Amino acid sequence: MRVSQIMSSPVMTLDKDQPLANAIDLMRRNEISRLVALEAGKIVGMITERDIAREMGSSTTYRLPPGRTHVSNVMTPNPITVAPEVIVKRAAEIMLDHDISGLPVVEGEYLAGIVTKLDFAKVCAEYDDIYVGQVMEASPTTVSPRDRVVHARRVLLDEDLVGLPVMEGGKLVGVVTVRDVAMKLAAFQEAVPNQHKSERIKNLLVGDIMSQPATTTRTDARLPEVSRLMLERRFSTLPVLNLEGELVGLLTKTELTQIARERL
C-alpha cells in the first residue's frame, strides 16, 4: 500500500507571513489539525494545533495576541516530506521515529497531499481480528473539571499526549484535547482585554473548555468500527470503557499508527 492511497488532498496552505489568527481560523472552519506554510509557493513549514496550544499559553502571547503574531514565529520549519509512492509502513515509521503527526506528500515541486496519523485509520479499518482492549493505551493520565486549563495544557505538552479524559467522582464527564486547548485559548486571547488576560487565563478551568459528553468506545469493540468512527468524526482520541462502564484506557491516532507499522 502506498501513501497516495491514504493521503488527504488537496492540502490547506497559507503564507508563512500571514497572521497566526488566519491559521487558527482555517483550522477551525475546516476541522483540520495542521496547515502547510509556504513562501513564494515553496514549503517552508508546518503549523499544528500543538504549536498553537504551546504558543497560546505562553506569557509572551498574553501581550501579543494571534492577530499580531505571524505563522513563521510558531510553525515548525523545514518539515519532513514523503513522495506519493512511499509505502505506508515507511510513513508510519517516520512519524513514530520523529514524533510527528503529519507529512506533506510531495511529487517533484508539487504538493500532492498530506498524510497524518489519523489517515492510518483507513488501514486499521481492515483489521477485523483486533479488539480495542488489545491495543489501547491503558491507565491514561486524567484531569478534573476543576483543574486549570494551564495545567491540562502543560500535561498535554510535557507528556506529548493527544487528549486527557476528564474525571469527576470516579466518572468520565468529558475529554480535553490539544485542539480544545488550542482553539479555546486562541478565542479567549482575542476576546479578553490585555490588562486582564494573564489573570483570566490562569483561572480558566478544564470544565469550561472540555468536550462533553465524551464519545467513548469499549474494550470489546472491534478496531475497524472504531477506526471508521475516528475517521468520520475526526476524533484524535477516544476514551475506552470496560464492560462495567469504567474508564480503562484511551485509543488515539498514535495507536493506529503503531498498528499500521506492525501489520503492514
Region spans (language model):
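The conserved cystathionine-beta-synthase
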Residues: 14-31, 38, 81-99, 106, ...
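Short gly/ser-rich anion-binding loops that grip negatively charged ligand groups
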Residues: 42, 64, 78-81, 85
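A glycine-centered beta-loop-beta connector
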Residues: 27, 35-50, 95, 103-118, ...
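Tandem CBS (Bateman) regulatory domains
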Residues: 1-10, 48-78, 92-93, 111, ...
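Short active-site-adjacent helix-start/loop capping segments
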Residues: 43-46, 55, 83, 90
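N-terminal coiled-coil initiation/transition segments in long coiled-coil scaffolds
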Residues: 44, 68-70, 87
